[in-house]
Amino acid sequence: MNRKIDYKINENDTGKTVEGFLKEHGYTHQVLVRLKQTDHGILRNGVWAYTNERLCKDDLITVQIVENECSDNIAPVNLPLDIAYEDDDIIVINKPFDMPAHPSAGNHDNTLANALMYYYGSQNKPFVYRCINRLDRDTTGLTIVAKHTLAGGILGNAVAKRAIHRTYYAVCSGCTPTCMRISAPIARKDASTIERCVDFKRGEYAVTDFIRIRYNPDNNLSLVKLRLLTGRTHQIRVHMKYIGFPLIGDFLYNPDYTYISRQALHSGRLVFTHPVTGQKMNLISDIPSDMKSLF
């Protein structure tokens, strides 16, 4: 996907090199190399610029990201998309349950990647699929997809620095504590390719905070709001099971389908800095009816 970005140089940036300025704005070495190989990739006041040139006040730096390739081996499939937000750099999807984020064995034409390949293909726009905060197949809610390499790199770095703040909602079995921090390392379970467990010897550092929003004594279920301080695979599901309040409907960790047919987990809020504009993004998705109806 193609993107043109303009930067007006102010007094604070005077004297910096073009490369130094762009690196401060999140351009990696890989992106800069690609721009150097692109016609009109980096312009200074409308003229081809070398990255070692020094900037002057009121210079106009224009970057042209050109991506004509598409993701390999992802078939475009016309699937419903609930778009929570979209601009030239990112798209945020409110993902339904029973939709994997990525193709895998047995899931070649029913994923979010397939849906987005069709969505952009129908607009004659080349598209490389870059999912930033991947959700499990049956987890609903907000997930960010970058539309070009610059946005993907900046947001990927934000994930590594824990600068994307994620709020989840879950329905758990039992009456949870009013609030709690769970700090317990997570590792892959022996003899399993997908299941995780708390393991204080082999596990990776993992921290989850939660507060209980509601409790229904009629069905002995709690609605909790959770904040991830780390991003381990199945972190919420494993942590809540570990403290004795597993998510209902979870086929791996608590296959109790009395009240719901899928794991009761929803990505309800994302707060992050926009990768290009620097704007603070605060996106919210309502708790779905299959969870809300239990309270």
Show the residue positions of the predicted features.
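Glycine-anchored helix-breaking recognition loops at helix->coil/strand junctions
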Residues: V128-I132, R196-V198, N254-D256
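Short loop segments at secondary-structure junctions
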Residues: K147-T149, G174-P177, A191, Y215-P217, ...
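Short small-residue beta-strand/loop micro-motif enriched in glycine and branched aliphatics
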Residues: M99-H102, I194, L221-S222
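Pseudouridine synthases involved in rRNA/tRNA modification
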Residues: M1-K36, L81, F200-V207, R212-L223, ...
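Short, surface-exposed secondary-structure edge patches
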Residues: Y50-R54, K225, R262
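Short Pro/Gly-enriched beta-strand edge/turn motifs at strand-loop
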Residues: I42, I65-V66, D190-I194, V207, ...
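RNA pseudouridine synthases
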Residues: M1-R181, P185, D290-L294
